[in-house]
């Protein structure tokens, strides 16, 4: 039997202590299987971004159990979490977070070079190939400041894929884009999911984006109030 890519059991996250503590995630239990494209929906303040940060090992859970690729995440030292994150997880945010003084190619290369401590020819070839794949073959050496919003988000997607992650966590990836560029980004996510088997968890307020996913999970006030069954 194949294990789920992500296994969360009674996962909770609180901020603050004592009477000032605020519980943002409340005993969430779910699985995400390899190759799925899952929409994470819910109103603002429901805990979507916090859940993505916990799944991405950027925030530690307060209680519960989290396993990714079968490996327990809770309690791992930060150095181990950083290595795991770099090798196995990709991130796309609503605001692209590109390094403004770097070219498109240099931005895509950054996670790979950071993980290895150096840049290699094979890394550059893969980064260039990813930029071609997302339709930016004529923008490879453009500075990030010169790119449009949609182009920046496609660079961010290529950057998320540079280390061949098993899971990409996308937090409102089309939320800052007009309809045309947003459609381009969602088409690319769908193609990469179908062709490469990369798993995506996509936080969104957009019903059209959620409809492009294979299933959905709904958060309300930090609780999982609905989810389609895992494939």
Curated annotation (Swiss-Prot):
It is a peripheral membrane protein. GO terms for cellular component: plasma membrane. ATP binds at residues 42-49. InterPro entries: AAA+_ATPase, ABC_transporter-like_ATP-bd, ABC_transporter-like_CS, ABC_transpr_LolD-like, MacB-like_ATP-bd, P-loop_NTPase. Its main location: membrane. Its EC number is 7.6.2.-. Keywords: ATP-binding, Cell inner membrane, Cell membrane, Membrane, Nucleotide-binding, Translocase, Transport. Transmembrane segments: none annotated. Residues 6-230 form the ABC transporter domain. The complex is composed of two ATP-binding proteins (LolD) and two transmembrane proteins (LolC and LolE). Part of the ABC transporter complex LolCDE involved in the translocation of mature outer membrane-directed lipoproteins, from the inner membrane to the periplasmic chaperone, LolA. Responsible for the formation of the LolA-lipoprotein complex in an ATP-dependent manner. Belongs to the ABC transporter superfamily. Lipoprotein translocase (TC 3.A.1.125) family. This is Lipoprotein-releasing system ATP-binding protein LolD 2. It comes from Rhodospirillum rubrum (strain ATCC 11170 / ATH 1.1.1 / DSM 467 / LMG 4362 / NCIMB 8255 / S1).
């Amino acid at each position: 039997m194949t294990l789920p890519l992500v296994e969360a059991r009674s996962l909770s996250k609180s901020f603050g202590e004592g009477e000032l503590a605020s519980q943002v995630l409340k005993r969430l239990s779910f699985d995400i299987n390899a190759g799925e494209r899952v929409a994470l929906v819910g109103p603002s303040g429901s805990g979507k971004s916090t859940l993505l940060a916990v799944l991405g090992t950027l925030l530690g859970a307060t209680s519960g159990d989290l396993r990714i690729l079968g490996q327990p995440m809770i309690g791992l030292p930060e150095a181990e979490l950083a290595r795991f994150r770099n090798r196995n997880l990709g991130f796309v945010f609503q605001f692209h977070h590109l390094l403004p003084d770097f070219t498109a190619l240099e931005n895509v290369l950054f996670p790979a070079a950071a993980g290895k401590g150096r840049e290699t020819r094979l890394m550059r070839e893969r980064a260039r190939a990813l930029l071609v794949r997302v339709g930016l073959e004529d923008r490879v050496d453009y500075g990030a400041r010169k790119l449009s919003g949609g182009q920046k988000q496609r660079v961010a997607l290529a950057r998320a894929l540079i280390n061949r992650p098993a899971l990409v966590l996308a937090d409102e990836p089309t939320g800052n884009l007009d309809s045309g560029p947003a459609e381009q980004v969602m088409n690319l996510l769908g193609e990469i999911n179908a062709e490469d088997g990369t798993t995506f968890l996509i936080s969104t307020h957009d019903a059209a984006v959620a409809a492009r996913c294979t299933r959905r999970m709904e958060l309300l006030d930090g609780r999982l109030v609905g989810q389609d069954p895992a494939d």
